[in-house]
Amino acid sequence: VVAITSAGQGRAGYAAADPAPAGAYTPPMSVHFIGAGPGAADLLTVRAVELLRRCPVCLYPGTYLDPEVLGHCAPATELIDTQRLDLDEITAHMVRATAAGREVARLCSGDPSLYSALTEQTRRLDAAGVPWDITPGVPAYAAAAALLGTELTVPEVAQSVVLTRTRARSTAMPETEALAGFARTRATLVLHLAITRIRQLAQELAADYGPGCPAAVVYRASQPDQIVLRGTLADIADRVEAAGLSRAAVILVGRALELGIDCAQSHLYDPVRDRSHLGG
């Protein structure tokens, strides 16, 4: 008997029990959506590495992935680069593999919860009756913040982080998610998929953040050719253009990025805070 949770719930729930009787329905193997992190092979989670070693099929985004990540796969793994495939073609590979009894690792840049086309792919898998699950990864903005040596939420400076992108050649933005609205909050702003519009964006954001607001651009964070640029909204576009960056970069804006910023102390660690109710 094999117990299967609903594919529509997104969990690959095979609970092994007694062997299935001859001729019984055998469910397809699972697809594992795996966050590949920002690129470095040693920034994958332990679970991600275990899945890559185990799965005989691996689909990966060749455009943004450090080839060393694929070194976690077994030598006999079938590797499929998805950068030139549409979603139907990608799904077809996954469905065929699972129907043949082969587990599939589907690598996603960064974390699958951000700009990974996860929803479109899982809907197709649900329609095909293929179970799937998700293994999170280190998002690109977190790797960028690490390289900058900064916290994005500094007490009494910024306690919110906005993760967004801008209107471009890609999917349209909802009307309620205009950049100007986010800028008015003056929260720490992280822009993905927007590096080609850096000059226009800097000008737009300066209206609320001010031209002297710290800004940074991190290209291919954690990878051998990574580039870190620091500046302000007044000059960050010049720095980006001088470096010739046109893709695979994250833009960060906000006072939390200010070097040596003077900030309040977190209440959580305030020495006068009453901790008598805490266990331990």
Predicted regions and their residues:
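Extreme N-terminal basic, low-complexity initiation segments
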Residues: 1-12
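Short, positively charged and aromatic/hydrophobic N-terminal segments
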Residues: 14, 24-25
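Class I S-adenosyl-L-methionine
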Residues: 27-138, 143, 237
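Class I SAM-dependent methyltransferase SAM-binding "motif I" and its flanking Rossmann-like core
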Residues: 29, 40, 111-185, 229-230
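A contiguous loop/helix-start segment that scaffolds small-molecule binding in enzyme catalytic cores
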Residues: 29-33, 89, 99-104, 123, ...
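Short, hinge-like loop/turn segments at secondary-structure boundaries
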Residues: 76-77, 150-155, 208, 232-235
